[in-house]
Amino acid sequence: MTNKVIYPGTFDPITNGHTDLIGRAARLFDEVVVGVANSPSKRPLFDLAERVLLARQVTAHLPNVKVVGFSGLLVDFAKEQQANVLIRGLRAVSDFEYEFQLANMNRRLMPELESVFLTPAEENSFISSTLVKEVALHGGDIRQFVDPIVAKAIAAKQGK
C-alpha cells in the first residue's frame, strides 16, 4: 500500500495557502489526492469542473499530486481512493474546534481514517477563499493570495 493522503476542500478558489499545504503534503506522502468537493450549498463562484481544472493547473508541477472532484461523503471518497489519511489545514485556533468535530465524525464513520493537521506558512495564515473573493469583488488586488491563473479566472468571472 502506498502512503496516500487526501486533501479535501471546496477550493473556491484555490489559494496560495492551499497550494502551500499541497506542496508540503507532496513532500511527506507518496501520493496526494486533492479532493475537490461539489458543495452546491456553498454557492461557489466556480462550478466543480472549473475548480478541478484550476487546482490541476496550479499543482501541475507536482508529479505525485492528482486532483479529483467528488460529491457525497468524504469517507466514501476516501474508500474509493483507497486512502486512510486526510490532511487539513489549521490557520488559527478558531479552526481547531470545527476540524476536531469533523475528524471525530469521519473517524466514527470510517475508524481507520486518520486526520493529520498542518499549519500554514506564516505569510498564508490569514488567507481564505472567502476573503479572496471578497477582496476581488471590491476591486482589490488578489495577486499575492492566488496563482496568476486563478486571479485571471476570477477576473473573467467578474467580467473584468
Curated annotation (Swiss-Prot):
One of its GO terms (cellular component) is cytoplasm. ATP binds at residues 10-11, 18, 89-91, 99, 124-130. It comes from Aeromonas salmonicida (strain A449). Homohexamer. InterPro entries: Cyt_trans-like (IPR004821), PPAT (IPR001980), Rossmann-like_a/b/a_fold (IPR014729). Keywords: ATP-binding, Coenzyme A biosynthesis, Cytoplasm, Magnesium, Nucleotide-binding, Nucleotidyltransferase, Transferase. Its cofactor is Mg(2+). Reversibly transfers an adenylyl group from ATP to 4'-phosphopantetheine, yielding dephospho-CoA (dPCoA) and pyrophosphate. Pathway: Cofactor biosynthesis; coenzyme A biosynthesis; CoA from (R)-pantothenate: step 4/5. Coiled coil: none annotated. One of its GO terms (biological process) is coenzyme A biosynthetic process. NCBIfam families: coaD_prev_kdtB (TIGR01510), cyt_tran_rel (TIGR00125). It is found in: Cytoplasm. This is Phosphopantetheine adenylyltransferase. Substrate binds at residues 10, 42, 74, 88. The record marks 18 as: Transition state stabilizer.
